[in-house]
Regions:
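Mid-core helix/loop region of P-loop NTP-binding domains shared across ATPases and GTPases
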Residues: 3, 83-86, 99-130, 134-144, ...
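Conserved AAA+ ATPase core "coupling" helix
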Residues: 83-90, 175-206
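C-terminal alpha-helical "lid" subdomain
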Residues: 101, 122, 127, 158, ...
Length: 266
């Protein structure tokens, strides 16, 4: 454990979606603003795509943190690879409507619509976030997504559907025209720039308790060159670099340490 060596209170580069470590890069903030717009203005559906490790999941956690808990009921699904009835049952459970066994599909739809109407009657919005949505390969389940967006009153959608996924999700949605037409907000996350990487690393270190970054400027440039600005890869490389420097009792992480750590990760 290298925490004491680097004067840290927490591990700074864990690849878990802890919203406390969310870094407001320009691309993530634009995505977040688009999602907030979709929720606040009742746009029905929004889709955020990006490569593996670009920060989609932590973005969803940041969104949940920024939505007023008194105004919005948020359900999050991380395993959408389900057949239609199991999918609807999972949606109901995500909205805290539990069943020991999945009831018939028609009953699920009636109960879901009833839950959404009750939320609206209390002045609450309903938000369904589906992570790893590119995993939905059953066309029947995609049809259920479209049907969710048919749940409307005369002037608004009963819920906001947010799809997060890898780039394949864009092609998946393209092949389902009725669903594609209902997605009002779309955005693709970009990689972090060199400047962002510098700020990202410093941000995570500060959240973890550091007063000063142990990475040299050349080390940060090497981190960017190796990872191409992909947050998950940055986390892995920084963590390994801090560990390597600690094991060698080095007080400063330089380019040589980063290069060696990157080779260990390949």
């Amino acid at each position: 454990m290298y925490l004491e060596h680097w004067n840290l209170n927490h591990l700074p580069f864990e690849n878990v979606p802890n919203p406390a470590f969310y870094y407001p890069s320009p691309t993530h903030e634009e995505a977040l603003e688009r999602l907030k717009y979709a929720v606040y203005c009742g746009k029905g559906a929004a889709m955020i795509t990006g490569g593996v490790g670009c920060g989609k999941t932590i973005l969803s956690r940041a969104l949940i943190n920024r939505l007023e808990k008194e105004r919005y009921h948020v359900a999050a699904m991380t395993n959408p690879l389900l057949a239609p009835v199991a999918f609807l049952h999972s949606v109901m459970c995500s909205f805290k409507e539990s069943h020991n066994h999945a009831p018939p599909k028609a009953k699920l739809w009636n109960e879901l619509e009833g839950r959404l109407k009750r939320n609206m009657g209390r002045g609450n919005g309903s938000v369904l976030i589906i992570d790893e949505a590119q995993a939905i390969t059953d066309r029947r389940t995609l049809e259920e997504l479209r049907m969710l967006l048919n749940l409307q009153t005369d002037d608004k959608f009963m819920l906001t559907l947010i799809l997060l996924g890898q780039l394949e999700l864009e092609h998946l949605v393209e092949g389902v025209e009725p669903l594609k037409q209902r997605i009002a907000i779309k955005y693709r996350l970009n990689h972090l720039s060199m400047q962002d990487v510098d700020s990202y690393v410093g941000h995570r270190l500060r959240i973890a308790g550091s007063n000063q970054s142990p990475f040299s400027d050349e080390a940060l440039e090497a981190i960017y060159a190796c990872t191409q600005g992909i947050p998950r890869d940055i986390n892995n490389l920084c963590d390994r670099s801090l560990l390597s420097a600690y094991l060698e009792n080095i007080e400063r992480v330089d380019k040589a340490v980063v290069d060696e750590a990157w080779q260990d990760l390949l």
